[in-house]
Amino acid sequence: MKRKSGILLAVTSLPSPHGVGDFGPAAYKFIDLLAKHKQKMWQILPLNPMGYGNSPYQPYGSKPFDELYISLELLQKDKLLPKRIRKFQPKSVRVDFQKVRTFKEGYLRKAYAKFLKEKRRGFKAWFKRNKWVYNYALFLTLKKENQLNSWLYWPEEHKNVLNGNVDLSPFKDEINFTMWLQFIAFKQWNKLHRYAKNNKIDIVGDIPIYVGVDSIDVFENREVFLLDGRSFPTHIAGVPPDYFSKTGQRWGNPLYDWDHLVNTKFAFWKDRLGFNAELFDYIRIDHFRAFDTYYKIPEWAPTAETGEWVEAPGYAFFDEILATFPHLKIIAEDLGDLRPEVLKLRDHYNFPGMEIVQFTYQGSKTKPEKYHTTNRIIYPGTHDNQTTYGWFGALEKEEQRDIVSDLARRGFNYDSVIDQLLAYTFASDADIAIIPMQDVLSLDDRARFNVPGTIGSPNWEWKLKDFKETKLRLPFIEFLTKKYNR
């Protein structure tokens, strides 16, 4: 793999006149900035409909996009909205998800009404290639009808609507509107992705290994998951207690019925990965270790202290997937305390893994050897870490002195220790270096994007108010890119 570098920035974090980043002009501007400053990759977070706590990792579906990503500015350009529309929190550095949804929905319904009135084309042809969207639209419409409650608590006729015994005529308009939103979102994304390709920028997509229980994935594929007779999960995903959490993490996602997946030649996953392979150039699979061993928590257990590790058919899985999609570019999120078999699985398929400077950097002390290859992606931190500024500031003074001393010994003599750590990242022998935007800008922990194991605000809310500071900092990133041959 050629040495290269890029930036990690959630689409929601882009500047916007309408309260949340989207697929509009700011996304194109960001690609321009990446290309101008010699970057080759843009890593994003999942684009699916955000579920509980506005988390992109608890989506209502693994195929659909969240309608928040639809750009009102592009709808104006398409003359589906008037030239002048109201702005919404354009200079905010946080996304107010509930308010921005209400704000954008009104304009999206107006655009849809005009689309119908003018009898515009394109939707029917798109729908023929994307029949999955009907069940999702039906699911979301019934979810609204049931006050957004989980489908597990819907009336039986709604819970089993896919059996075909329900009169859906009262919901026809809302179903059609929801399908149209997906048509527009995918149209805007595909155009943006082509623009990135034309500028030689690879998009790194992100797929959570698990899906949320309150999702179309579970709703229409109940046989794929470990559920009881009422469709409730019998066991759920998470991780056991460790240094960071005394009771572990109880994520709540339903676990796969791996016997069923094996018997169906992993059809559910083939559909999912094949779909995403058309949207992104690389796919980062979150919690890769679960393809080797996954943690199985009884649903009744209040914490992750009660659970067991169970082996998964990782080799059979990837043999089948790669036979079907031989050119699939997978990045393995292989962080944490792993058994050697996880790394063997990763290396057997030559998947690049991840290295986090905050985890592995130990100043003048010996670094733990997790890799014996350049085939990895190095980050100062990810969306789940403190910002590098916040992390360094929280260290003991002695640790800070050790790191500063060691960076100087290695020849990283820049204006700030954050810039020295960025240089350390770029100088690594890892093939790819990716820097979170918060670290490009040397921001403190007020800009931290997510704290694992916590739910709700301020997670996922940070955004740029504009590109002014970004433009000032990117020349330094370009300098490091050239200096370290990326």
Label the predicted regions.
Residues 7-9, 22, 44:
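Active-site-adjacent substrate/metal-binding segments within catalytic domains
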Residues 474-486:
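C-terminal accessory segments of extracellular proteins
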Residues 25-50, 278-280:
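Catalytic domains of carbohydrate-active enzymes, especially glycoside hydrolases
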Residues 35, 189-199, 322, 346-347:
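Surface-exposed amphipathic alpha-helices with a cationic face
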Residues 45, 202-204, 208, 282, ...:
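Outer-envelope exported proteins of Gram-negative bacteria
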Residues 10, 16, 54-186, 211-434, ...:
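Alpha-amylase-like alpha-glycosidases and glucanotransferases acting on alpha-linked glucans and related
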Residues 1-12, 28:
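N-terminal regions that are enriched for targeting/export leaders
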Residues 178, 182-212:
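Conserved, well-ordered alpha-helix/loop/beta-strand core segments that scaffold catalytic motifs
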